[in-house]
Amino acid sequence: MQPNITGVILAGGRSSRMGGNDKGLIPLNGKPLFQYVIDRFKPQVSDLVINANRNQGLYKESGIPVIDDIITGFVGPLAGMHAGLSYASTEWVVFAPCDVPALPSDLVSQLWQGKKQALAAYANDDERAHPTFALMHISLKTQLADYLIRGDRKLMLFLDSINAQRVKFSGKADLFSNLNTPADCDLWEQKRRGQ
């Protein structure tokens, strides 16, 4: 049986490929990108929080609590994961980036079932790993902080170092498509209008 799990939307990055515009706030069909993630993610978790390091007031308008990085300096998704592990009142925390509007509706249940005895798991489709879609036990918080303090930033290296379980999401590569550029957003909107 799946326990209560806290969900964390990772929106703390610099969005350099979006020209510095806060990626989660980019409008898609009149709705901010992160709101699509909330709509898909919230039904899967018992508690939801957004990790953001700027424009926090705009994220708070969603009614979802907003937390910033404890380890500062825009050090990447691992800093947001550390903040989420520090915030959570549940034993397990699941993460999703703010730029994947079609994330799988079974993300959390699949990660939970696929983790086996591991303290962490991450998504992998037929083509590649998606380490920002990860489930972690809060006991990893100290190990993650130590990793970041040493200056390490690579998410996959951290997941490998803790023996995270890779969980296969076959036939779902399109659900993990992230929108990194304005052109990606335009293409996504065109596809939605064509459906």
Curated annotation (Swiss-Prot):
Keyword Transcription regulation among UniProt keywords: no
HAMAP family, A to Z: MobA
Function: Transfers a GMP moiety from GTP to Mo-molybdopterin (Mo-MPT) cofactor (Moco or molybdenum cofactor) to form Mo-molybdopterin guanine dinucleotide (Mo-MGD) cofactor.
Species of provenance: Yersinia pestis
Reactions performed catalytically: Mo-molybdopterin + GTP + H(+) = Mo-molybdopterin guanine dinucleotide + diphosphate
GO molecular function terms attached to this record: GTP binding; metal ion binding; molybdenum cofactor guanylyltransferase activity; nucleotidyltransferase activity
Gene that this polypeptide is encoded by: mobA
Family from the record: Belongs to the MobA family.
Listed SUPFAM superfamilies: Nucleotide-diphospho-sugar transferases
Cellular localization per UniProt: Cytoplasm
Binding site for Mg(2+): 99
Keyword vocabulary terms for this entry: Cytoplasm, GTP-binding, Magnesium, Metal-binding, Molybdenum cofactor biosynthesis, Nucleotide-binding, Transferase
Source domain of life: Bacteria
Required cofactor names: Mg(2+)
GO biological process annotation, one example: bis(molybdopterin guanine dinucleotide)molybdenum biosynthetic process
Subunit structure: Monomer.
Binding site for GTP: 10-12, 23, 51, 69, 99
Disulfide bonds: none
InterPro entries linked: MobA-like_NTP_Trfase, Molybde_CF_guanTrfase, Nucleotide-diphossugar_trans
Name of protein: Molybdenum cofactor guanylyltransferase
UniProt EC number: 2.7.7.77
One term under GO cellular component: cytoplasm
PANTHER family according to UniProt: MOLYBDENUM COFACTOR GUANYLYLTRANSFERASE
Domain free text: The N-terminal domain determines nucleotide recognition and specific binding, while the C-terminal domain determines the specific binding to the target protein.
Claim: GTP-binding is one of the keywords in the record: yes
